[in-house]
Amino acid sequence: MAENKNNLSINDDHSNAAMTHTSDAIASSDFIIRELDLNQEPEMQRESKNFWQDAWAQLKRNKLAVVGMIGLIIIVIFAFIGPVINKHDYAEQNVEHRNLPAKIPVLDKVPFLPFDGKDADGKDAYKAANAKENYWFGTDQLGRDLWTRTWKGAQISLFIGVVAAMLDIFIGVVYGAISGFFGGRVDTIMQRILEVIASIPNLIVVILFVLIFEPSIWTIILAMSITGWLGMSRVVRGEFLKLKNQEFVMASKTLGASKFKLIFKHILPNTLDAIVVTSMFTVPSAIFFEAFLSFIGIGVPAPQTSLGSLVNDGRAMLLIYPHELFIPAMILSLLILFFYLFSDGLRDAFDPKMRK
């Protein structure tokens, strides 16, 4: 006990010595007292972002999506200005200049690029045809300028894809919204009708529709829209089933909001992200399907053209004049690839669960 008391007294002495040393080492004059003016101090606030601003920020971080977006913009610009910057019309024929290879000034001096105007045998095809003007993408078997026809075809393919997607959005959103909002027997009947339509092969429906009516761009668009809206309707129906029992919808319903107001003011705006993403995947699907129809010979009628029609025309000349197939096929492939890259980036930006 005596030993413990001695230890305690020693510890107390050390503590008192430390406190004395600390108080002597730090004087009050070492501190500077300043008055704080809250009105002049900068406020540290985080910039608030809404849903669309946050989605745009996420999209910009996705490098592949940015590449797809830039590529799409470039192709769309060339689709509209490409036929204009060339003096040749897309339907103009000159059989004396048929099957000429691509020749682009300046680039024809680069040895490894296929823009020197020489044929498969290494001969100057322009000199043999006595052609004094350059055809940037060459000519086809009828002597039509492939530069103008390629970008005119891209323009028509984009038109078909975008308009078909808009029709799919309109029909699918209306059908899916009604089915998902009302539910019950209405939903059951509408879904059975949808299953019957979906059981019919899409290709057979489109081919029969195109063969019965006069072939045209609008015939192809309407034919693709017969069954193209089914996927959109399922997406919208699922969103409505998820949102119609949410608190903000039930609160508006309790306050006496009409069904029209509930659908178009409260529920539908909250499904726009799913609609945008689905529609962005619909456009390349429609472009590819139109190219397939043109490839089997029931696409856009002559003299109009599309990328699919150009690929079909160039297929017969593949072994002799490969540029007639490779150039439109490359533009078509890049167009669909850029659409899918951009669409995939949109899906990741709109869906927080997909973000890394």
Where in the sequence are the language-model features?
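Gly/Trp-centered helix-boundary motif
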Residues: A2-I169, V173, M317-I320, E324-F338, ...
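Alpha-helical transmembrane segments of integral membrane proteins
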Residues: T139-K356
